[in-house]
């Protein structure tokens, strides 16, 4: 169950250092995303999204990050889903990119806001039609009697939009942006003496593992 990570001496892999953030956290995160994609990691933009419900109980799930910029990271979902309800009561979240095969992870946390309708529409237009229909068919996080019933709902919306060249954005669907209040880069190293670099309040600092 234990994984041994690399080191400069062991495999020649360079140590994560504050200098790697000379161009800012966005540049390094994008570079690591590209490295994960090049390594063949499935869905390298997957994040473990953490929220808390109205009672303060934490919940995590995996979603896909769809954009990274100087303001933060963005994902899209059903606003009426469990995560949407959590964010309505506590608009703060954490997100972790877990690249186990590379011995890397990046953690982002901060306040959450909905993106504009224009940004949602732009992303929606790039989704495959099947994904668009699936978003209409599913009342996300709500109970359903069977998969057959879910497929019936999909068939119904497929028929409803059969004569439409484009499928409109559902009224309860859109994006959220996590404003990057804290960003932490982690690199697994030999003997569990890992590298951790945190960006917070304009400061870049090394943390003990």
Swiss-Prot record:
Entry note: cofactor: Binds 1 FMN per subunit.
Gene3D superfamilies (alphabetical): Electron Transport, Fmn-binding Protein, Chain A
Cysteines engaged in disulfide bonds, as pairs: none
Gene Ontology MF: a single term: FMN binding
InterPro entries linked to this entry: Pyridox_Oxase, Pyridox_Oxase_CS, Pyridox_Oxase_N, Pyridoxamine_oxidase_dimer_C, Split_barrel_FMN-bd
Family according to the record: Belongs to the pyridoxamine 5'-phosphate oxidase family.
Function: Catalyzes the oxidation of either pyridoxine 5'-phosphate (PNP) or pyridoxamine 5'-phosphate (PMP) into pyridoxal 5'-phosphate (PLP).
Protein name: Pyridoxine/pyridoxamine 5'-phosphate oxidase
């Amino acid at each position: 169950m234990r994984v041994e990570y690399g080191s400069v001496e062991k495999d020649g892999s360079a140590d994560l250092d504050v200098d790697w953030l000379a161009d800012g956290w966005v540049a390094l995160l994008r570079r690591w995303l590209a490295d994960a994609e090049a390594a063949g990691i499935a869905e390298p933009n997957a994040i473990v999204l953490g929220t808390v419900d109205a009672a303060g109980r934490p919940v995590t799930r995996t979603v896909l990050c769809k954009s990274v910029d100087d303001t933060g990271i963005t994902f899209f979902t059903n606003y009426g889903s469990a995560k949407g309800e959590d964010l309505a009561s506590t608009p703060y979240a954490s997100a972790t990119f877990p690249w186990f095969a590379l011995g890397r992870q990046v953690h982002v946390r901060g306040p959450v806001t909905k993106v504009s309708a224009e940004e949602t529409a732009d992303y929606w237009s790039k989704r495959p039609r099947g994904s668009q229909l699936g978003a209409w068919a599913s009342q996300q996080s709500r109970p359903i009697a069977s998969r057959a019933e879910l497929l019936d709902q999909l068939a119904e919306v497929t028929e409803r939009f059969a004569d439409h060249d484009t499928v409109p954005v559902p009224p309860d669907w859109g994006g959220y942006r996590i404003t990057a209040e804290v960003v932490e880069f982690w690199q697994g190293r030999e003997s569990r003496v890992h590298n951790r670099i945190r960006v917070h309040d304009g400061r870049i600092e090394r943390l003990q593992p």
